[in-house]
Amino acid sequence: MAKSYDPAMHSAEHVLNAVMVRRFGCARCFSTHINPGKSKVDFRFPRDLSPEEARAVEEEVNAELSRGLAVSARPMPREEAARRFNLSRLPADAGEELRIVYVGDPVAPVDACPCIGEHVENTLQCGHFTWCSHEFTPPAEGENLGVLRVRFRAGN
């Protein structure tokens, strides 16, 4: 991992993904840049978000983080993971056994996905999540989804 990598920010990003998928029915982000000061994620999205929607996502992420959920990782055969998750962001050499990160109870997690990154042990270690800004780039001609870029912070 990079010297400036922030496990709390990364774990908060997992919860942000879960909230966005649950609230809007979109796919998980397709691009992520995790930094200690401010991070950003990009979602394929059909429209811009209103300020009220952004605040609601921020509140929901904070509600999940404040539950003190365990963050754990378990191995899963690649074949099973391919049936349950989108593996397109994994490196080709990830192997036949993948590491699945769970936020919350692995039986009914708030979030679960293949991930090679470092994480906190409990969501309380993420601190407060702040939705700093977002911008929407409309879809290119012939496409139905644009890009919603979200910038956020986590920590105390």
In which residue ranges do the predicted regions lie?
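Active-/binding-site microenvironments in catalytic and ligand-binding cores
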Residues: 1-156
